[in-house]
Design a protein with these regions (language model features):
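Short, low-complexity N-terminal intrinsically disordered segments enriched in polar/charged residues
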Residues: 1-35
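A solvent-exposed, acidic/Ser-Thr-rich amphipathic alpha-helical stretch
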Residues: 32-88, 93-98
Length: 143
């Protein structure tokens, strides 16, 4: 196992970024979520689906995906943990994150699932962190 050469302040910056990004997603603020990606960022979150490309494409994909919850008072929470960062030659970061999605309905018991691994390429800019690409793999789909 290699030791990461990512500075602690950068690691903390990425954790804060993920917290804000997931809170935007869970609150249904899809434009805010999409703005955490580069202009040409890619987002692939469902097995077998084509990636959404660009911020407008990401918003459209999230709106399409969440239509299934239109008449359902469900609250979904994305829990990111075990963030592993590795510097890439171009100055960006490879990020591998374990993710659990917790779903709860009023008066119900929280349910955990799916269990996923998030593979990101992150850019650190003067303005902060942006996601260049995201591929989400689902553990239940593993061979």
């Amino acid at each position: 196992m290699s030791v990461s050469t990512v500075r602690p302040d950068v690691y903390a910056q990425v954790q804060h970024f993920y917290a804000r990004q997931m809170q935007a997603l869970d609150a249904g603020r899809f434009a805010d979520y999409a703005n955490t990606f580069t202009e040409d960022g890619t987002f692939q979150h469902s097995p077998g689906a084509q990636p959404a490309v660009g911020r407008a494409g990401i918003v459209a994909e999230l709106e399409r995906f969440h239509e299934r919850f239109a008449d359902d008072p469900v609250q979904r929470r994305h829990w990111f943990n075990h963030v592993a960062l590795e510097p890439l030659p171009d100055g960006s970061l490879s990020s591998t994150v374990y993710a659990l999605i917790v779903t709860v309905r009023p008066g119900g018991t929280p349910k955990i699932g799916p269990s996923c691994v998030v593979h990101d390429v992150l850019e650190i800019t003067e303005e902060g962190v942006l996601t260049r690409s995201r591929l989400v793999t689902h553990d239940q789909e593993a061979a």
